[in-house]
A protein has these predicted regions:
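Intrinsic disorder/low-complexity segments
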Residues: 220-248
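N-terminal helix-turn-helix DNA-binding core of bacterial DNA-binding proteins
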Residues: 4-39
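Short, hydrophobic-biased segments on the C-terminal half of alpha helices
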Residues: 48-49
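Key DNA-contact positions within bacterial/archaeal DNA-binding proteins
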Residues: 42, 98
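Mid-protein regulatory/catalytic core that forms ligand/cofactor-binding pockets
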Residues: 108-214
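Basic, amphipathic "hinge/linker" alpha-helix immediately C-terminal to the N-terminal HTH DNA-binding motif
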Residues: 63-82
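A short, conserved structural fragment
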Residues: 52-61
């Protein structure tokens, strides 16, 4: 495999581990990576062996996958470039919001050590991506709330912190329904057996699948006590829902 192709593939694995762990609070194991990346478990196993050989990941006795210091550095660099590319696409090129993730994935590997700081300056030193994720190295703490809309009690008003960005169809649904970082939202009713949640987003009433709601991370409306969360673990709220959610 040519070195450039190999590096791109390695970076994709490293960033997937980084996002699952730091952005979504997942315990990262091989089967979840296969589901997330939509590739076969044997392919994941082969790449993990290569990443271990290169001292980029470690696998502990429970089969949990961890980034080494160098793996974390590599992943964080690619995440930073990806999110800067998203900002470029949406704020400068005016690309449709829901298309930015996929297009940024094509651009991120072309951003160099020379162009990255200039891009950061030209964009006005953004601190978050269009989808609400912190940009590493932008000067804000990388501490994210791990509670999703699916875990908020009915009638509790919260603010959307960030949304799952890796599904263009889902992002378009979010956009059309006003589900964006910073928007206020109140879950009004949960139909557990139907798997749906009805929420008020701004002035709109939106019905979505509970799996979709688990891909919307939220913050308390104002500083102070945490909102009344309904039993969903704040650190593991996204577990079991990685991959390609649907809005039904």
């Amino acid at each position: 495999m040519p070195k450039q192709v190999s590096n791109v593939a390695s970076d994709d694995y490293l960033t997937a581990i980084y996002r699952m762990n730091f952005d979504e609070g997942e315990d990262v194991i091989a089967v979840r990576m296969a589901d997330r990346l939509d590739i076969t478990p044997p392919s994941v196993a082969g790449m993990l062996k290569r990443l271990q050989r290169d001292s980029l990941v470690e696998i502990d006795s429970r089969k949990l996958i961890h980034l080494t210091a160098e793996g974390h550095r590599r992943a964080e660099q690619m995440v930073r470039r990806h999110r800067l590319a998203e900002c470029l696409l949406t704020s400068v090129l005016k690309l449709d919001w829901w298309k930015a993730y996929e297009e940024a994935h094509l651009l991120e590997h072309g951003i160099s050590d020379v162009t990255e700081p200039r891009l950061f300056e030209a964009l006005g030193k953004p601190t978050r991506s269009p989808f609400g994720y912190p940009i590493p190295g932008a000067g804000i703490p990388y501490v994210l709330p791990m509670t999703t809309l699916a875990g908020v009690a009915e009638g509790t008003k919260v603010i959307i912190d960030r949304v799952f960005e890796e599904d263009e169809e889902l992002l378009r649904f979010f956009y059309e329904e006003g589900i964006r970082p910073g928007a206020p939202v109140v879950p009004e009713a949960v139909a557990a057996y139907r798997g749906t949640l009805t929420a008020r987003v701004g002035e709109r009433t939106v019905v979505m699948g509970t799996q979709v709601a688990s891909h919307i991370w939220v913050n308390a409306l104002t500083p102070g006590p945490s909102p009344d969360f309904a039993g969903e673990g704040s650190r593991r709220s996204a577990r079991g829902s990685a991959g390609r959610p649907r809005n039904g």
